[in-house]
Amino acid sequence: MVGDDTYDMTDIWEIAFVDKATLGSTPQVTAPSVVKLLKQAPNMRIWAKLLDATGWGAKMMPDAKAEKAFAEKYKAYAGRYPNNTGTRTPFQAYRRQGFTLFAETDKVFNKEWGVPMPIYDEATQSITNWEAIKQVLNEQCGKIYSNLKPGDLTDKENAVNIFVATHLLNSNMQLANNSAVRHATEYGYTTGENINEPSTNYTVNVWDYYRTAWPQESKLLKITQTPDGQFYLNRFSKYDNGLKGTYVETGTLQEGILAHARNEVDGSVYNNVALYGSYHPIDNILSFNSDYASAMKSERVRMDFTTLLPEIASNNLRGKDAYFPTDYFSTLTNVSADTKIQLLYVRKGWVDYQGDELLVTGNYDFTLEVPAMPHYGTYELRIGYGVNTLRAKSLLTFICEDEAGNQDTWGEPLVLDQSDPVMASDGIAQKDADLNYDETLCAENDYALHKLGYMKPPAYFHIAGYTDSPARGELGRSYNGGNMRRVLTTSNMSPRMRYYIRFQSLNNASRAQLHLDFIEFVPRLVDVAGEPYREDVW
């Protein structure tokens, strides 16, 4: 880094950030920060000031020394394909950090909260009525979040600071097709002839959840793309979710907030993508208020495993194959030297949620941080994976940590054997078709499996790569012995705790594969009869 915003393109680590071919022989390139891009946009004056005033703008800068050191450490591996893992994937020798901001426009603040429109002095490049704006922001944010430090916007207990933090994600993504969410195998969707260049003929909602940057408490931002291509934040929907349903959205519990891929003002488009981050205008106030809390109490949270690793999005790796060094991910800790981590994208005939999957081989031992749920309560934790004879056996240990750093367990240790087709061999699991899609019989079969700690895959996704709409018999739920969900633990979760799962290999074969497709956090609701709450099959 030459100056505040200028990078030396002769450094090898920078090649990962900017396509040098587009720059000719220019040795340096100006790389404006997200804050500077906001200052250039006439409708983002308040947010530009907020990032400066709260200190979050400075926190959104990459650790240049760490990233350069990483690239120097692994530059000899660039372009290599490790051949000791059983599959051939390119070594990921470069890593970038990234951030995403969802930002209300000045007019949205004015309309929804009565915040004065900023009076901007072009000569000094400052807002002359900032104190009046700050007063209203303090009042409005204090209605949503506790405001223990109302006078200091940089304090983590200040309501405005919390408001800003809950608009930020610790990964850089674009609101473009197959970025924030991934289209691959959802119900009714067909990729077209080339599975690596999926079609945009969307059929049902696709979504994922991301933990916001607020460090004190877990708030999950739900990003949904509807079949018309629009993106919404915290949209909670009703669906045609019966056994023979189509999962088409039939209504909304909360419509959510429309978010935009680019910032267009009076016919002019302002750049919203910086070197290491981006911002996206939103059409209403984003707040994690009581309405959000109410919706999340009964929300089944299903996340692609790649979402738990922020660097996947920041380095635009979804839908790609990659091999990772052990120190690549910020949410993986205590990784043993013999842990081999790969990302694979779906091939024709595979059954994967959203197309991506992680494979871990070797004598692996690592700890994965998983998000706390934003509502205190009892949750059932599950993972989805594919079963075959190449799969691994692992010991899973569940660790939690309070704000003071004290550690405890949040579940009993569990041995996960992904090579054992339990549901196929025990004679209990039956296909819906074999039960004639009878609602009662299928529900009873699901319940019998669940008591054993297993579940069929969701009906939501199907076999990949077909160019015609898949038949109901090709859904993941129509179980062919190759996919399942395993209940890992049932435990109380607090939004103010940190949660981890330690995975340890119990294999003799170094190429035995730990397969990680998706993870689910499901509230343990019970009805008046005491029977476990039966969620929909999707």
Where are these regions (language model features)?
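Mature, structured domains of secreted/extracytosolic soluble proteins
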Residues: 1-538
